[in-house]
Amino acid sequence: MSQVLLVTTNYWPEPTGIAVYTTDLAEMLQTEGHRVTVLTSLPHYPWWKVPSEFAHLTEGTRSHDGVEVIRANHLIPTKMNALLRVRFETSLWRNLRRVSKTKLGNDYDMVIACIPTVAAGIIGKKIARSLGIPFGLIVQDLSGAGAKQSGLRG
């Protein structure tokens, strides 16, 4: 049985695209016999806040459908522009990094990062490199929507 670390910004209970995909991926790997840990953010998308029904999903470790889920606190802007996008990504990076150093073990066989956020990719790669294990990157979205939400044109 291999031990997989999935690093992503979007995970259950978020109801849209990337969270649905990463949740299905983690649960499928777990069903296939792998031990899966997810390092993720607070549930915030598409609401840009933590809804009251998910307020109990604060920073810390919990299990959901057999998958260990480790969440990190972070800035959640209520509106998005270019500056707030940078602050959001920076907050994700700092807090995922901090939590990865205090809550994760070193017994993983591989790290998978699922992005559109740069933070998840960077943290996943650094963890894999520090443990000397394989790293996989799934590019789910190239942040075109993020650029549009931030008021950037291209």
Functional labels for PLM-detected ranges:
Residues 1-61, 65:
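N-terminal subdomain of nucleotide-sugar transferases
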Residues 3, 109-110:
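Structural motif
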Residues 6, 38, 71, 137-139:
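Hydrophobic residues in well-ordered beta-strands that form the structural core
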Residues 9, 13, 77-84, 131-154:
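Acceptor-binding helix/loop patch of EC 2.4 sugar-transfer enzymes
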Residues 23, 27, 31, 98-102, ...:
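Short, well-ordered alpha-helices that flank and scaffold nucleotide-derived cofactor binding pockets
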Residues 35, 68, 134:
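Residue-level detector of anion-binding/catalytic polar loops
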Residues 40-103:
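A conserved catalytic-core segment of Leloir-type glycosyltransferases
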Residues 85-97, 110-133, 137-140, 144:
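An aromatic- and histidine-rich active-site surface loop
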